[in-house]
Amino acid sequence: KIKWFKTMKSIAKFIAKEQMKKHLGGE
C-alpha cells in the first residue's frame, strides 16, 4: 500500500511539472 502511495506521489509530481511547463511555454 505504501509503495503504491509513493508511486502516486511521484506521478503527481511529474504531472505537476509537465503542467507547469505547458503553462509557461504555452502562454
UniProtKB/Swiss-Prot annotation:
Keyword Glycosyltransferase assigned: no
Tissue: Expressed by the venom gland.
One example GO MF annotation: toxin activity
Key word Glycoprotein present: no
Family statement: Belongs to the cationic peptide 04 (cupiennin) family. 05 subfamily.
The species this protein was found in: Hogna carolinensis
Keywords (A to Z) from UniProt: Antibiotic, Antimicrobial, Cytolysis, Hemolysis, Neurotoxin, Secreted, Toxin
GO cellular component entries: extracellular region
Function: Forms pore that permeabilize the cell membrane. Promotes efflux of calcium from synaptosomes, causes hemolysis, and dissipates voltage gradients across muscle membrane. Potently inhibits the growth of bacteria, yeast and Leishmania. May function both in the prey capture strategy as well as protection from infectious organisms arising from prey ingestion.
Protein name: M-lycotoxin-Hc2a
Subcellular location: Secreted
Domain of life assignment: Eukaryota
